[in-house]
């Protein structure tokens, strides 16, 4: 039994060395980029800004901000390394300055999945501050496959300031919303009016910006609706006027007419009861749905968006340090 355990440890050490990760006397595993390759990089678009450092044989460390969302930080693993629990976060001087004292920043939760460590905007800003000051960041926790084996992930500050400046420029060009936030939207109307109130314009302006920026948008489906008050024929005509008014708002601001599919339904598809004033207010609406098709060779992740399946039926929109 003792020989079997010793053999397992020797095999584990051989495998780790073959993978190119360091193993100390207690099989401490350290993942870090080689010094000559430990540069920070930026992927920039109007949809998302990504500041990241590739980590050899581990994955990557990422500062990400999608359009319309706060910034966050995460570690992405190629293969699972950390056990669930809490990792220690420490700051230390970089390799080329020699060994120095480590300063603890606290603990961070570790969860299962491709992103075992995730940090919100406030915590990610603290990490950025340490990297700008030329400090190394160290995440330390036990391995999921052996409790006695520590796993460490090291982030280097090399070329961070230059990349962060580029990242900030990207942030200034982000759209106000992302696809998930805008692809199903609803504009409401007052009483029997065929025109929406001015307070609905910001939503439509955000939608227009998105449609004009996304080359893979194929259709914007516009559906007009009314409440149950009045004659059905009158309501059908009113829903048509509302849908066309919204369509005109889009086309006069640059959305190509050929992208629009305009439909109207009168009172046929209520989303709430017409017996109350609140319900009727919800039913007086025009819904907009953005359909898009992106070739498989392209990735929504690179644009910072998540894929969504759409149907033809009219629908209402719905640190830690």
Question: Where in the sequence are the language-model features?
Answer:
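Periplasmic OmpA-like peptidoglycan-binding domain that tethers envelope proteins to the cell wall
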Residues: 226-321
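N-terminal targeting leaders that direct proteins to extracytoplasmic destinations
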Residues: 26-177
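Bacterial N-terminal signal peptides that target proteins for export
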Residues: 2-15
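Second-shell loop/turn segments in exported
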Residues: 116-118, 188-197, 232-236
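Periplasmic peptidoglycan-binding/tethering modules of Gram-negative envelope proteins
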Residues: 136-218, 292-321
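Extracytoplasmic/secreted proteins, especially bacterial periplasmic and envelope-associated proteins
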Residues: 126, 199-206, 237, 241-245
């Amino acid at each position: 039994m003792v020989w079997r355990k010793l053999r397992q440890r020797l095999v584990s050490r051989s495998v780790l060395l073959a993978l190119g990760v360091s193993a100390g006397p207690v099989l401490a595993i350290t993942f870090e980029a080689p010094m000559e390759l430990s540069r920070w990089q930026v992927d920039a678009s109007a949809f998302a800004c990504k500041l990241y450092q590739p980590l050899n044989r581990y994955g990557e460390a990422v500062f990400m901000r999608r359009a319309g969302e706060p910034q966050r930080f995460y570690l992405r693993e190629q293969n699972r390394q950390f056990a669930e629990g809490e990792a220690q976060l420490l700051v230390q001087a970089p390799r080329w300055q020699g060994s120095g004292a480590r300063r603890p920043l606290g603990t961070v939760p570790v969860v299962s999945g491709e992103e075992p460590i995730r940090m919100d905007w406030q915590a990610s800003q603290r990490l950025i501050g340490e990297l700008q000051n030329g400090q190394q960041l160290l995440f330390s926790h036990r391995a999921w496959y052996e409790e006695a084996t520590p796993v460490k992930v090291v982030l280097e500050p090399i070329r961070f300031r230059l990349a962060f400046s580029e990242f900030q420029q990207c942030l200034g060009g982000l759209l106000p919303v992302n696809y998930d936030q805008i692809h199903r939207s609803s504009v409401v109307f007052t009483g029997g009016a065929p025109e929406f109130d001015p307070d609905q314009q910001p939503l439509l302006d955000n939608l227009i910006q998105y449609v004009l920026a996304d080359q893979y948008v194929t259709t914007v489906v516009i559906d007009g609706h009314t409440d149950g008050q009045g004659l059905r024929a009158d309501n059908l005509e009113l829903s048509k006027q509302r849908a066309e008014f919204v369509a005109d708002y889009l086309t006069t601001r640059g959305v190509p007419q050929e992208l629009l599919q305009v439909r109207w339904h009168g009172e046929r598809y209520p989303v709430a009861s017409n017996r109350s004033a609140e319900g009727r207010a919800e039913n007086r609406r025009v819904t907009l749905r953005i359909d898009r098709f992106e070739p498989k060779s392209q990735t929504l992740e690179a644009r910072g968006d998540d894929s969504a399946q759409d149907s033809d039926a009219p629908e209402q929109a719905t640190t830690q340090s």
